[in-house]
Amino acid sequence: SLVTLSHTAGQAWAHEGMPPARRTALVAVASTLGIIVPPSLVLLLLGDAMLRAHTEGLTLATQLGLASAHAGTRIINTQDVLQAALAPGALLLVLWMGVTWWLAQRRTGGIADQGAASSAPVPLTRGERWTLGVVPTLIVALLALVTTGRVRAVEAAATAGVLLLVWGVASRQLTLRRLAQVLDDAMALTGALFALLVAAVTFSLVLRAYGTDALVAEWMRALQGQPLLAMGVVLSVLLGSAFVLDAFELIFLIIPIVMPPLLALVDDAAWVAALTLLVLQAGFLLPPLGYALVLSRAQVAPRPAMGAVARALAPYLLCLAGVIALVMTVPATTQWLRSTPATLPEMSIQGDDLDALMREMSHPEAPAPAPAASATPP
């Protein structure tokens, strides 16, 4: 995402005279939107990791006799994480769009001066106008279906892929050379993800063999009764790790170690997942070691000073910090669009009712054969 934005929007902004520091900030900010805005690949992988961590956390809570083991907590799935992250992601997107519009209106250290030369916009062709109208509509429709739970995120992604192939063939823009390049990139990314998964799982097993998970669980047990403090510790670890690890490495390596003890103390795992996504996004943007920030600076020529980039990033980071504080203090922000509760309803079945229910669920006995009718003489 970052490299694509640098070579497309970044070059257009440079042609318009936007300073390098602001181009760097905008590319870094826009490239991290795929972390929190559903249905991103990072969010899907985190949902799967949180499902395993939540299962292990409830098992740990049962072994330690914690209160969360008897709270009737329901194991989360990817759909829960998608719905929990939707409201915070939408709020952050609106705030960042507002900041970008406000900075563009000020034109202070931003777009080129009035006297700067700029080329007139090239009019769109009929095919480009059709593409501009159809593709965003399709994306919004698929996102709406995923958000409402009518289709799974993987199904929506597969549908989009098939429709994109059909559109490429119908518009005669998809050639064999482009198709081969797309398939090659897709296989390279898939292979890299599987290699990263194998390496991360192996490393996690090595750490567990040395008792790292038991040590972390013992530390988190010392914070029993203070779930917010425990969450702050875990989120701080994730924030620091985001300086040197990318999102996939964090999900495959760090989440399986630190999340089960935390989810043994906290009931709402989807709320924790939404906060995790926001903190990862902050770690990628914080100067001077933010992962997205470092990569974005490397794509801009001339390379801007870190101080200028930090000043350009400050409004976006303030908005992100505000959203994190809001979600942490008001967990209901992750529950507005969720279709299923975090806990299961309490049900008590008496002995007689249980016996009756088991009889209803058992196979009915075969009816006795009817007696043969007696033959009548002709």
Regions found by a protein language model. Give the residues of each.
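Alpha-helical transmembrane segments of multi-pass membrane transport proteins
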Residues: S1-P378
